[in-house]
Amino acid sequence: MYAPLFVAIGGFFGAMARYLVSRWAARRSPRFPLGTLIVNLLGSFLLGWLAGSGAADAAKLLVGTGFMGAFTTFSTLKWESVQMMQQRQWAKVVVYLAATYLCGVWLAWLGYHVGR
């Protein structure tokens, strides 16, 4: 009964956190999608940690589905990659995708083990 409320509250805070991280990163790295990289890598670690922590179902809804669902972004990653490809920034897009996927999986694994 409370599940949608937990997801909505977590989603609100996740969206706000993503906005703040993205604005901060854009000022520091205007030519590279640092904000998206940060939220996706941090989100991978935190979701792994949550999964390993044995958290209650309500916490998983609030933090995992709500906060992390709004904080991380799959579609922006893809669109930024397409933009780099359109600009023929091949090295940059390879580094971006490799860092996102390889480091993301490793950080999820690490977070899971830290959470245990």
Swiss-Prot record:
Na(+) binds at G69, T72. It catalyses: fluoride(in) = fluoride(out). It is a multi-pass membrane protein. Pfam families: CRCB (PF02537). GO terms for molecular function: fluoride channel activity; metal ion binding. The keyword tRNA-binding does not apply. Na(+) is not transported, but it plays an essential structural role and its presence is essential for fluoride channel function. It comes from the Bacteria. It is found in: Cell membrane. Keywords: Cell membrane, Ion channel, Ion transport, Membrane, Metal-binding, Sodium, Transmembrane, Transmembrane helix, Transport. GO terms for cellular component: plasma membrane. The keyword Metal-binding applies. Disulfide bonds: none annotated. InterPro entries: FluC. One of its GO terms (biological process) is cellular detoxification of fluoride. The chain crosses the membrane at residues 1-21, 32-52, 54-74, 93-113. Belongs to the fluoride channel Fluc/FEX (TC 1.A.43) family. Fluoride-specific ion channel. Important for reducing fluoride concentration in the cell, thus reducing its toxicity. This is Fluoride-specific ion channel FluC 1. The gene is fluC1.
